[in-house]
Regions:
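Conserved alpha/beta core of the MobA/IspD/sugar-nucleotide pyrophosphorylase nucleotidyltransferase superfamily
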Residues: 2-6, 155-206
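N-terminal glycine-rich phosphate-binding loop and ensuing alpha1 helix
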Residues: 3-56, 60
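Residue-level signal for inorganic ion chemistry
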Residues: 12, 25, 37, 90, ...
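Short, structured coil segments at secondary-structure junctions
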Residues: 24, 47, 67-70, 170
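Hydrophobic residues at beta-strand termini and immediately following loops
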Residues: 31, 74-76, 134, 177-179, ...
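Acidic helix N-cap motif at the loop->helix transition within catalytic regions
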Residues: 60-66
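Conserved donor nucleotide-binding strand/loop of the catalytic core
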Residues: 70-81
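Conserved beta-loop-beta/alpha segment of the NTase-like Rossmann-fold superfamily
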Residues: 80-148, 152-153
């Protein structure tokens, strides 16, 4: 009997206030002709079975930037309280049937579908039982991949559920994923980050 393919979903956090880029929503900034959030969502769609986008700040504009993509949308009315609330909203909306879930940031423009597929493959080959945290040259990155059984434990924590707290409290359930590039530790928070990314002539996601 052929083994069932390993099935991963992504929770894409796109609700934040872009506090470090005053006056602009960084997710709507165009990179290579498309909004940053759309570029990132397409990467996860290419590598994952399903993608759940958590909306909050300027949610209507972010949703509009994603028009036409086969995504599931989740609203986080408490987005101003910070990222943990978006994580809670995202994992609460997940359907059954996944083996693992990526908690992903929408501002990582350097990531490619190949990067994400490699992380998912490492989880599958390792038996899918541990949280995988990407590192590059000693620096901790994103996305973090959670086995679905541990997502259930996070849900049970209610308002106390937070990725970093859960990881730090359960080191025995966590493994490092040594990334081959800096894509996992590169994000766009400031105009300086954007300029550095554009100067680096990053390839389009593939």
């Amino acid at each position: 009997m052929t083994a069932r393919p390993f099935k991963a979903a992504a929770v894409l956090l796109a609700a934040g206030l872009s506090r470090r880029m005053p006056g602009r929503n960084k997710l709507l900034i165009e990179i290579r002709g498309e909004p940053l959030v759309r570029r990132t969502a397409k990467v996860y769609l290419a590598a994952c079975a399903d993608v759940y986008v958590v909306l909050g700040h300027e949610g209507d504009l972010v949703r509009e930037a994603l028009t036409g993509l086969p995504l599931s949308f989740v609203e986080n009315p408490q987005y101003a309280e910070g990222q943990p609330g978006s994580v809670r909203a995202g994992i609460a909306s997940l359907k059954d049937g996944y083996d693992a879930v990526l908690i992903a940031l929408a501002d990582q423009a350097a990531l490619t579908a190949g990067d994400i597929a490699g992380l998912i493959r490492a989880c599958a080959e390792g038996g899918g039982g541990r949280i995988l945290v990407p590192y590059f040259q000693g620096n901790r990155g994103n996305p973090v991949l959670f086995p679905m059984r541990l997502i259930a434990e996070m849900r049970a924590q209610g308002r106390n559920a937070a990725c970093r707290n859960f990881i730090d409290s359960n080191p025995q359930l966590t493994a490092r994923y040594e990334a081959a590039s800096d894509h996992f530790v590169t994000d766009i928070d400031t105009l300086a980050d954007l300029a550095a990314f554009e100067e680096g002539c990053r390839p389009n996601p593939a």
